[in-house]
């Protein structure tokens, strides 16, 4: 059952081929036998099995929804009343939220079973999942390599067949990059499509929640469940949500694909370039029109992103002072010492680095030169991408410049870590939807292909990705049967 698609799982549960209790217990067993992946921070086994029993009764009465009785995992930055919400930080190691995030409520309403919460880079800051208070996550394809970040635990849980699907967040590539490294599918929706209420903020103008699964077909099922307006989120967009599962089954009209030359630079591994070119050839054979495009502002994507992201992070994380909530230092005799020591002890090195960077670019004398300038460049990047997408359906390229790197290889080189996001940050800066799907292997390590589309073009993106996956088998590869 672990190799079933979500649609197959849903059908099997509704047909009573096996029970939700059996499926949930199977996932719990898989998690327990793969503890070395370190994909989970917390498990809720007893409650999950109770909910599975309830789901079986609902299914028996023929009242189930598509996700009823299906176990899932949640990145540990979504607030949950039952389980701690740690953000993989000492600062919040014992924090229990008084409410559920909107996305959690939606899954409960749709009958999905939250089996546990996954490991991540601390406060979602990182591209390797090595910046966690609870230890590094390992890649199911090679346990000596990173799964990507910051949603590495969610990606590893799906790739390792521990759960059928999981939820992550994407601020600069934190869904798409781990999806690429772990050989699965992941989508960052348009900014405002999925509620951020109850999702602990890293950079509020960039953060967006989204799903991991094996295929675009599975992603469509999940996205239909979580998309939609939420009055509790001031950035939520009120618009009609299509039935993504139905949309991807419609015939795909002629596809116009934009192919940027800047995505094929020397620092992009040759195996990745070859895999992307092979994908382009397949699309051509399927009738797509390939259009060469020039993204002149691509060299500014990463520096612009890190100025804005760090600035917003320094502001968002200023609330953790050890007084209202968060880690409280025991070695302080004054208020200033309490705040200083609590933050010094509670935050890890990468989070401190980004807070300091953000504080610097927002400080007097540097605000205009860095932050304001970055916001102007952000607008130019957004305009260039929107103009380009007026002439093509999608922009296609590699999700990452390399395959998964070894644990510890880049941990002391933040610049190299930041450059892992070189192809993904633009979608966040512009608020565009983007999806990563598997497209091959290099030295037995997965390669990801990224498709970026217009605002609220998730139906088209998912349809094109599904069209590709109907003609390839990369998304069916399994770490136990390496490609």
UniProtKB/Swiss-Prot annotation:
EC number: 6.3.5.7
Lineage: Bacteria, Pseudomonadati, Pseudomonadota, Gammaproteobacteria, Legionellales
Catalytic class of the enzyme: ligase
Entry's family note: Belongs to the amidase family. GatA subfamily.
Free-text function comment from the UniProt entry: Allows the formation of correctly charged Gln-tRNA(Gln) through the transamidation of misacylated Glu-tRNA(Gln) in organisms which lack glutaminyl-tRNA synthetase. The reaction takes place in the presence of glutamine and ATP through an activated gamma-phospho-Glu-tRNA(Gln).
Catalytic reaction annotation: L-glutamyl-tRNA(Gln) + L-glutamine + ATP + H2O = L-glutaminyl-tRNA(Gln) + L-glutamate + ADP + phosphate + H(+)
Keyword terms: ATP-binding, Ligase, Nucleotide-binding, Protein biosynthesis
Active site: 75, 150, 174
Assembly, per entry: Heterotrimer of A, B and C subunits.
Natural source organism: Legionella pneumophila (strain Paris)
Protein's name in the database: Glutamyl-tRNA(Gln) amidotransferase subunit A
Pfam families, A to Z: Amidase (PF01425)
Superkingdom in the source lineage: Bacteria
GO cellular component entries: glutamyl-tRNA(Gln) amidotransferase complex
GO MF annotations, alphabetized: ATP binding; glutaminyl-tRNA synthase (glutamine-hydrolyzing) activity
SUPFAM superfamilies registered for this protein in UniProt: Amidase signature (AS) enzymes
């Amino acid at each position: 059952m672990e190799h079933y698609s979500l649609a197959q799982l849903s059908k099997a549960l509704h047909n009573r081929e096996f029970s939700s209790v059996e499926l949930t217990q199977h996932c719990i067993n898989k998690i327990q036998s793969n503890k070395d992946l370190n994909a989970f921070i917390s498990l809720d086994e007893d409650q999950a099995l109770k909910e599975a029993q309830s789901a079986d009764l609902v299914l028996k009465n023929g009242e189930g929804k598509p996700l009823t009785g299906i176990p899932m995992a949640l990145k540990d930055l979504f607030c949950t009343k039952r389980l701690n919400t740690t953000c993989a930080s000492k600062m919040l190691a014992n924090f229990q939220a008084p409410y559920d995030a909107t996305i959690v409520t939606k899954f409960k309403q749709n009958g999905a079973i939250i089996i546990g919460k996954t490991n991540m880079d601390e406060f979602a800051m990182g591209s390797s999942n090595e910046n966690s208070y609870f230890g590094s996550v390992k890649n199911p394809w090679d346990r000596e390599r990173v799964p990507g970040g910051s949603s590495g635990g969610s990606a590893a849980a799906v790739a390792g067949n521990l759960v059928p699907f999981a939820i992550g967040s994407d601020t600069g590539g934190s869904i798409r990059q781990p999806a690429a490294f772990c050989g699965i599918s992941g989508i960052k929706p348009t900014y405002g499509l999925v509620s951020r209420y109850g999702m602990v903020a890293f950079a509020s103008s960039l953060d967006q929640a989204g799903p991991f699964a094996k295929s675009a077909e599975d992603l469509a099922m999940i996205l239909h469940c979580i998309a939609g307006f939420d009055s509790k989120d001031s950035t939520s967009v009120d618009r009609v949500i299509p039935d993504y599962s139905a949309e991807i089954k419609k015939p795909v009209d002629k596809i116009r694909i934009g192919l940027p030359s800047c995505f094929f630079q020397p620092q992009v591994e040759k195996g990745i370039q070859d895999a992307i070119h092979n994908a382009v050839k397949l699309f051509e054979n399927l009738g797509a029109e390939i259009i060469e495009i020039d993204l002149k502002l691509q060299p500014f994507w990463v520096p612009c992103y890190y100025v804005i992201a760090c600035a917003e992070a320094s502001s968002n994380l200023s609330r953790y002072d050890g007084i209202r909530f968060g880690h409280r230092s025991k070695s302080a005799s004054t208020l200033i010492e309490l705040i200083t020591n609590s933050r010094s002890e509670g935050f890890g090195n990468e989070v401190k680095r980004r807070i300091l960077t953000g504080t610097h670019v927002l400080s007097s004398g540097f605000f205009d030169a860095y932050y304001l300038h970055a916001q102007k460049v952000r607008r130019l990047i957004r305009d260039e991408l929107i103009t380009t997408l007026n002439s093509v359906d999608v922009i296609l390229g590699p999700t990452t410049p390399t395959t998964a790197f070894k644990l510890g290889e880049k941990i002391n080189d933040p610049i190299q870590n930041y450059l892992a996001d070189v192809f993904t940050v633009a979608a966040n800066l512009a608020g565009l939807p983007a999806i990563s799907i598997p497209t091959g292997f290099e030295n037995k390590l997965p390669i990801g292909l990224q498709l970026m589309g217009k605002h609220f073009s998730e139906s088209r993106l998912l349809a094109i990705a599904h069209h590709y996956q109907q003609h390839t088998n990369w998304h069916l590869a399994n770490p136990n049967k390496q490609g």
